[in-house]
């Protein structure tokens, strides 16, 4: 079993970032709700737990009814790191004082380190004229610790928060008022790595080659000689799940690839070539274009389109699954954020993680057991796994694509003609993004954008081509940059790149005579148009 760090979640929006930073240090971490009982904590320690991290929260530590840290956390003898609310709870429960702050801190702050603690010693972003090392951090709090608990010493301070960090190094307790897990805290990654390795004593035994070996062994033990069926969409999660399961059990896996006529250009061919031809995976390729297009005729409402596409997918998949009489397992590309959300860990009030996470909407009447080989991994780890399994990087690192496909990138009613025009326009846009490099970073603009695509607008505009008048459709280009997809900024693509994309689309895709670029951020707009 890998060395582990337990993260207790009290409802912070960035708790998952803590787990990701710990794993980036090569240490396995798990998130559990903050209201677990003492027995759970003691059991974790008995199984070799190396340390505990307490997350932030929107709640107030000193208000009645606020979630308390299990007492066992401070009794079992492993190092503990409290972050924001975690620091306040630690102080409150160990004899310190927490008060409402007259000067709330939200955003950047400059913190001075004190006391040469193991956590912060030697870390600094700049030095003051007086020689004090200073850290650039991200704060988000309305309460603050005003009196240290017995045994603690001051570890950090700001002008408006005299106790911005504290430590009881004899017991291995550390706490900071700022958020080391977010990228805005420059030394945050180093702090968390120092906590899990230098303070908790983790060696960093979490790596992808070992994970593959362990996952393959688990799948073989779980499945035995049974048959497995998987709905392959061509997306990252289902593709990596298929590659991993096939590595484990070979021809016991059958993938069902449903082409609803709303995929990207040549996507069906790429999936078949990658999995069937190159990797030898058994794939049932179902061309259900006519079925989907027929059901979408006359439907303009975005939500109605999504429901129709989802319902028809389930129907097609069910039909194909029924033909595979020996299948006893349904495999899904469920990943760790899905598991956390299904447990309600975002609220910090869930007590257990559900074992069944039916993200695909497939009915329980299939009577299949669930196989989720990626449920321990974050998205970036899934991509790393995909490359290690031999999947093409352009498949593993492709931008997100909605389940309904082009159905929600064609505004209004979906028609075969519209889908063909959009497919070709979108392919040109993506090709140019992949070919265009930003000289400052050396990266392509495809790598610099988090998501990019074309949108078909079912309106016509007047144009001139040669000596003739045209009256053809409009395409909008959308490219955004984001860390978490909760908020997003439109990408500042170079004008020559946009001009090249526009020229190619208008000249190569007959039926389109105007291209526009979407400069809306999220919020107020959403990333997708529908």
From Swiss-Prot:
This protein's record includes keyword Secreted: no
Catalyses which reaction(s): XMP + L-glutamine + ATP + H2O = GMP + L-glutamate + AMP + diphosphate + 2 H(+)
PROSITE patterns: GATASE_TYPE_1, GMPS_ATP_PPASE
Pfam families, A to Z: GATase, GMP_synt_C, NAD_synthase
Keywords for this protein: ATP-binding, Glutamine amidotransferase, GMP biosynthesis, Ligase, Nucleotide-binding, Purine biosynthesis
Domain (GMPS ATP-PPase): residue spans on this chain: 206-398
Record-annotated active site: 84 (nucleophile), 179, 181
Ligand binding (ATP): 233-239
EC number: 6.3.5.2
CDD domains in the record: GATase1_GMP_Synthase (cd01742), GMP_synthase_C (cd01997)
Superkingdom of origin organism: Bacteria
Residue span, Glutamine amidotransferase type-1 domain: 4-205
Residue ranges of the TM segments: none
Subunit structure as annotated in this protein's UniProt entry: Homodimer.
Protein name: GMP synthase [glutamine-hydrolyzing]
Phylogenetic lineage: Bacteria, Pseudomonadati, Pseudomonadota, Betaproteobacteria, Burkholderiales
């Amino acid at each position: 079993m890998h060395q582990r760090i337990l993260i207790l979640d009290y409802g912070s929006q960035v708790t998952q970032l803590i787990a990701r930073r710990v794993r980036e240090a090569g240490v396995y971490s798990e998130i559990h709700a903050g209201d677990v009982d003492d027995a759970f904590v003691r059991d974790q320690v008995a199984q070799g737990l190396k340390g505990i991290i307490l997350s932030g929260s929107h709640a107030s530590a000193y208000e009645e009814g606020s979630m308390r840290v299990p007492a066992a956390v401070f009794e079992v003898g492993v190092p503990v790191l409290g972050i924001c609310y975690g620091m306040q709870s630690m102080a409150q429960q160990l004899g310190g004082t927490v008060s409402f702050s007259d000067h709330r801190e939200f955003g950047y702050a400059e913190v001075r380190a004190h006391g040469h603690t193991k956590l912060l010693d030697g870390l600094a972003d700049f030095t003051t004229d007086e020689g004090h090392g200073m850290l650039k951090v991200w704060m988000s709090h309305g309460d603050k610790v005003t009196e240290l608990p017995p045994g603690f010493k001051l570890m950090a301070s700001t002008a408006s928060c005299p106790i911005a960090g504290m430590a009881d190094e004899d017991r291995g307790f550390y706490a900071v008022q700022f958020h080391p897990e977010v990228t805005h805290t420059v030394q945050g990654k180093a702090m968390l790595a120092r906590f899990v390795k230098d303070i908790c004593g983790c060696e960093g035994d979490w790596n992808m080659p070992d994970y593959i070996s362990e996952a393959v062994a688990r799948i073989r033990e779980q499945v035995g000689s049974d048959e497995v069926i998987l709905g392959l969409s061509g997306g990252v999660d289902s593709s990596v799940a298929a590659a991993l399961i096939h590595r484990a059990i070979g021809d016991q896996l059958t993938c069902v690839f449903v082409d609803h006529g709303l995929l990207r250009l040549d996507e069906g061919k790429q999936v078949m070539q990658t999995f069937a031809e190159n990797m030898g995976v058994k794939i049932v390729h179902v061309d259900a274009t006519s079925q989907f297009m027929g059901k979408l005729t006359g439907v303009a409402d975005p939500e109605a389109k999504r429901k129709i596409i989802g319902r028809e997918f389930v129907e097609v998949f069910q039909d194909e699954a029924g033909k595979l009489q020996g299948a006893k397992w349904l495999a899904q590309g469920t990943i760790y954020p899905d598991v956390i959300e299904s447990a309600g860990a975002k609220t910090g009030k869930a007590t257990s993680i559900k074992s069944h996470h039916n993200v695909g909407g497939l009915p329980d009447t299939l009577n299949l057991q669930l196989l989720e080989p990626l449920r321990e991994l974050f998205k970036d780890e899934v991509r790393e796994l995909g490359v290690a399994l031999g999947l093409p990087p352009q498949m593993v690192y492709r931008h997100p694509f909605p389940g309904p496909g082009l159905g929600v990138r064609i505004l209004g009613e979906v028609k075969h003609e519209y889908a063909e025009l959009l497919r070709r326009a979108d392919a040109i846009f993506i090709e140019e993004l992949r070919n265009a490099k930003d000289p400052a970073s050396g990266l392509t603009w495809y790598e610099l954008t988090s998501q990019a695509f074309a949108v078909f607008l079912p309106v016509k505009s007047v144009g001139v081509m040669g000596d003739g008048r045209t009256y053809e459709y409009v395409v909008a280009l959308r490219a955004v940059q984001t860390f978490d997809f909760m908020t997003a900024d439109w990408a500042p693509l170079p004008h020559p790149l946009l001009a090249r994309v526009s020229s190619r689309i208008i000249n190569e895709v007959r039926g389109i005579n105007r291209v526009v670029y979407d400069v809306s951020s999220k919020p107020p707009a959403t990333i997708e148009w529908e």
